[in-house]
A protein has these predicted regions:
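Residue-level marker for buried hydrophobic side chains located in beta-strands
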Residues: 3-5, 37, 71, 130, ...
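Histidine/acidic-residue-rich catalytic or RNA/ligand-binding cores of hydrolases
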Residues: 15-18, 48, 140-148, 167-180, ...
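Short acidic/histidine-rich active-site segments
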Residues: 41, 186-200
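Extended substrate/RNA-proximal surfaces in nucleic-acid metabolism proteins
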Residues: 42, 47-159, 211-220, 227-246
Length: 246
């Protein structure tokens, strides 16, 4: 089991990240990745870039060196009703992949029912592609209720490698969420959530957990170039050249 793309990374325009776009892409190439998504925090996050960062994402070349670059965002799920960062449709136009995640600075934890309702609202949000780091134990929610509805709304679930080391008690949550994704055949991505170039593509802990439960590789959208290409083709995006698919 492997990944060929890292779909959750942050560059230094996010203040608590440390590497430039060039450094992140070079790290992806050094790791042998075919693609990387740059997914900085939304503009209303106290540590996020200005909205113009996102409106200018289309300045980033599709391919830098050997690596395909996906233009993304990590939305903050906002309290209390499960909104996302306020950003204009014009600024969102270049965005090709969007995660939505709980962060304590934008959504102080409450209880499972409130968190579940917020996630349910995100299911209906057309701008969001994926749920980010759902295993955070500060945000308990009804796992089965949300996961069982993801396919109906075209949402994938991220298994976040960083959660396994920095978010207390997230391992069991991540495993339960992964088992439910397997049960309901919900596609997932496996990502580093890297905030520095040295961690790009490092998802060993997440892959080990998935192998432990026998998670099917065909449900991991970033486990092959073909699967990733098919995922984005389904959303009208031509991601890879023919030579990349050989």
């Amino acid at each position: 089991m492997q990944i060929i793309a890292d779909l959750h990374t942050h560059t230094s325009v996010t203040d608590h990240a440390f590497s430039t776009l060039t450094e992140m892409v070079q790290a992806a190439e050094d790791r042998g990745l075919a693609a990387i998504a740059i997914t900085n925090h939304g503009p209303t996050n106290p540590d996020g870039p200005h909205e113009w960062h996102f409106s200018n994402l289309d300045l980033i070349p599709r391919k830098i060196g050997k690596v395909t670059v996906i233009r993304g965002i990590e939305f903050d799920i906002t309290a209390p009703a499960g909104g996302i960062n306020v950003i204009s449709n014009k600024s969102l136009k270049p965005v090709e992949f969007a995660l939505a995640s709980f962060h304590e600075c934008m959504f102080p934890p409450v209880d499972s029912s409130v968190h579940t309702a917020a996630l349910e609202a995100i299911l209906y949000n057309p701008y969001v592609n994926a749920f980010g780091h759902l295993g955070n134990s500060n945000f308990p929610f009804d796992h089965e209720y949300i996961i069982s509805r993801c396919n109906d709304h075209g949402k994938i679930v991220e298994i976040n490698n960083a959660s396994l080391s920095i978010r207390k008690d997230s391992h069991d949550n991540c495993m339960d969420i992964a088992r439910l994704c397997m049960k309901y055949e919900v596609p997932i991505s496996v990502d580093s959530d890297s905030h520095i170039c040295y961690r790009v593509g490092h998802v060993e802990g997440a892959l080990e957990m998935l192998e432990e439960i026998g998670f099917p590789e065909e449900l991991i959208i970033n486990s092959s170039v073909e699967r990733l290409n098919n995922y984005f083709k389904g959303r009208g995006l031509h991601l890879f050249d023919e030579e990349d698919l050989l």
